[in-house]
Structure formats: structure tokens, C-alpha cells
Amino acid sequence: MNKIIKLIFVLCCFCGIAQAQPQRPKLVVGIVIDQMRWDYLYRYYARYGEGGFKRMLGEGFCVENCKIPYIPSVTAIGHSSIWTGSVPSIHGIAGNNFVKDGKVVNCTADDTVNPVGSDSKAGKMSPRNLWVTTIGDELRLATNNRSKVIGVALKDRASILPAGHHANGAFWFDDKSGKFITSTFYMDKLPEWVNKFNKQKFPNKYLSQKWETLYPIDSYKESTSDDTNYENGIVEGEKAVLPLDLPTLYKKHGYKILRNTPFGCNLTFDIAKAAIEGENLGRNTDTDLLTISCSSTDYIGHQVGVNAIETEDCYLRLDKALADFFAYLDQTVGKGNYLTFLTADHGGVNNATFLQDQRIPAGIWNKKGLVDELNKNLKTKFNTNKDLVKTIMNYQVFFNTDIIEELGLDYAAIKQAVVDRLKKDKDVHYAFDMEKTSIESIPEELKFRAINGYNRERSGGVQIVPKPGHYDYYSSKGTTHGAWNPYDIHIPCLFMGWGIQHGESAQPHYMTDIAATVCAMLHIQAPNGCIGTPIF
């Protein structure tokens, strides 16, 4: 009898241990739609199908009031902040480009690595400029590297930064070869599944057709007409009118034209499926992670703006691509076995001319010649023949601090002189010394975003905040992003699948809460720079 009791006790202990193991999904899929404004969920809602955005809204949990907690609101920072739960001040990615060691650098450029799959410089990329861990890094650490982490996107930074340092691979599109490539940071040769995918020449198939509207063009009621002075051509020098003869454009411009069509999103989901099959994602003992970024929405948005038929058609096609991808996940991983979230890295402002035509205050902030003007004024004021201002980007003024230090000049006084000049600009709302942000007489909504966005080593010394509806852009047509305003920082945030109950919340949340939420659901440590709070 005693032996039986002992046996039962031991079995109960083992059962307790088994039950104590945290429940996790087989696969986590994070989808970032580049430049997707929150209102796109509803602007085109009536024409969405049941399996894409509507499925996420109907089955999942929608965070209606999710915003970006920093400036500038640009792609590299957005992707970094989503997947790290952090901000530029901490994670180090201060822009798509920023100043590092006195030089302007691309956020993922790395001369210490070589391209894999191409001889293009597009392969000399890595996440080394990212100072913190990502969700995927922490997942790999938590499972003793048993979990697999893969990142895919057309843009290098949109694949590399989400996947993180410890990923099994990150793959991005090379315009020169029309193939997906990687770098020696991850591996010395492409996996066989990537080679197999590249040999299928999906880009050629997509570029062998016309881009025609999905529905009759006169039924696109959420957009302006198809030929307006608000739009650049989908490719510079081409007219912004559908249909587009892609075979002809391909002959003139090469593979890069694919980025500026909705079919770039289709190609991204194609390689996402290939990654799932090639790496057996979602079929392992431990949770795997796939990061996906749809970059074409950003390329199209920049060229034609928020109100274009091309933008509307892109999202209607994206909705179908999402529906197809979710159906694929249901079949391969199993409905209820995967957790997915969808969000954006930033939004986009309405074209200034369009707003002016609606009698809404707007304009292009013209900084042409401003660097030269500032340097001329500073040379006179501080009695030097050296240029003290390096450049203006990310709505920040960057200074030649090494020269200022060498000459023994008062850096604070130099910055104040620049601030005084900028405040005279009719399109500038605020200008301030980044090191004095906390004591500036500006709204808290701006103050905390400027502080979060300021990286002492990589940001400029003076912050510029244009008036609402005003922005810095090379063209009066199309659109851009980067500001603190709702059109740039209010983003969609949807969760669906494993562990998610249907619902919605209008409570304030931030982009940085996404990583905290996913890690809490997986019962793993949050990324080491995470400042977010779990949403549920």
C-alpha cells in the first residue's frame, strides 16, 4: 500500500511539473504595414473582404488608441520600437539615417559584413547599430535557442531591425538581382529554401502584368480623381494614372519598380510562406517567430499621398493578401495555434496642396539653403571661418561638435542662436535645444516625445517642430511623415489568434506596449530596453 501511495505521489509531482510549464502558441507572426494610418482600418472598411482586416477586427482585439511615443516618426525607429518596446533614446536607432562618429550613416549599414546571395552593396547590412534586444532575441534566450526567428521584408531595415541580433535569419529584396538576400552577419550562404524561392522568379511574374484597379475605377469613392496635382508618378517621371504598364516600366527602371506597386506586398507574403515551410516554423516543440513588414504601402504613399486611388487600391489588394495569408496559417499551423499582431511603423500626412484646397492650414516647410544661412550667421557671430552646422534631417539640426570643441566655442550659445533664427520661420511651431527639452514651455505631448526621441550620441542638437499640416519634403506632391501629430503617430494595433479574446479598447496605449504584451503572453523576459506595459 505504501508503494502505491508513493507511486501516486510521484505521478502527481510529475503532473504538477507538466502543468507548470507555460502555455505558448506554436508560432508568433508580427505584421507591420509601413505608413498605415489608423483610419485606413475604417476608411476602406466597406470594401474589405471578410478574411483580412475585418477578420482581425471581428475575431481579434483592437487597440483603437495606440500612438507613437517619440519623434521623429520614421520607418527605422518604428520597426525598432515595435519589436524592442523601446525608444530612440534607449535603443539607439535615431532615424533612418543619423550621425555616428561624426558621419551620416544608414541605420543598418555595416561595412564589416558582406552580402550573401548578391554582389550588391544592399547586402552590407546588420542590426549592429541597435543597442537592445528584440522579442525574438528574448524568445531565443528563453528557449535555449530552440525557437526559430526569421524576418522578411522588401526594405533591409524592416527585416533586420525586427528580427534582431540573435535571429536565425533576416532576408530583404535586392533591386539589382530581383532576389531576396541577406548578409554574413547571419550566415555564409543562403538557405536552400531561399535559393528555391529566388529561382521561381516571382518578381518577374508580378512585373509581367498591368497594375489595374481591382474594381471599376469610378467606384473608388474614398479617393480623389486619378489625375491630380497632389500626386507624383508611381515612378519619378511617369504619370500618376492607372492602369500602369508594368512590363514597360520594368524595362526602363528594373526590379525596383516592384516596390512601388501593391504586388510588393504579395511578394512579401510569398517569401513569408516560403520561410514557414523552409524553416518548419510553427511545427517545433518551442514557439517560433516570424517578422513581416509590408514596405510597398510606404513607397506608394510617398509618391501619391493619402487620398489617391492608388493608395485605396493598394489597401484593398493588401486586404486580400492578408486573407490569403491567414487562411494559409489556419491550414499549416492551425487556427488557434498561432498568435498574430498587425500594426504600423508610422502614418502619413495629407498632401499640403490638397489640404489648402480644402481651406485647411498646411504647407511645405522649405529648408533649402537653411544650412548655408545658419553657417553664415554663426561664422559672423562666433568669429570663425568653419561650418558649425553639419546638416538638417529628422527635423533636427546636427552640429559639427568636434569643430566646436576644437575651437573652444560655447555649444549652448551656438544652439541658442540657431533656435532664435528658427523661431522666426512662419512654418515652425517650436524650436528648442534638445538638452533643455524638460524645461521648455511646450505641451507635454511634445515634450515627452522629444525626450524619448533624443539620443545623445546620434541625434541633432536642436529640435524643430513644424506647425500642424506642415512638413519637410522634397516635393509639393505625394506625402511624408515624421512629426508628432495624430496623422503620423496614430497607428493600428490588432491582435488575433492564440490567447486573444475578441474585444477593443479606447484606452491610451503606445507602440512600445506591443513588445511588452507579446512577451507577457509568452511568459518570457521583455527586451532589455523595453519601457512598455502589457495591454492585457
List PLM regions with ranges.
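Short, structured active-site-proximal loop/turn typified by the sulfatase FGly-forming signature C/S-X-P-X-R
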Residues: 41-90, 148-152
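Bacterial Sec-dependent N-terminal signal peptides
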Residues: 1-24
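Secreted, luminal/periplasmic, and some membrane-associated catalytic domains
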Residues: 48, 65, 74, 96-124, ...
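Beta-strand elements within well-structured catalytic alpha/beta cores of enzymes
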Residues: 25-37, 56, 82, 139, ...
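Short, solvent-exposed turn/loop segments enriched in Gly/Ser/Thr/Pro and often Arg
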Residues: 63-83, 151-161, 293-295, 339, ...
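Second-shell loop/turn segments in exported
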Residues: 37-43, 68, 121-127, 255-262, ...
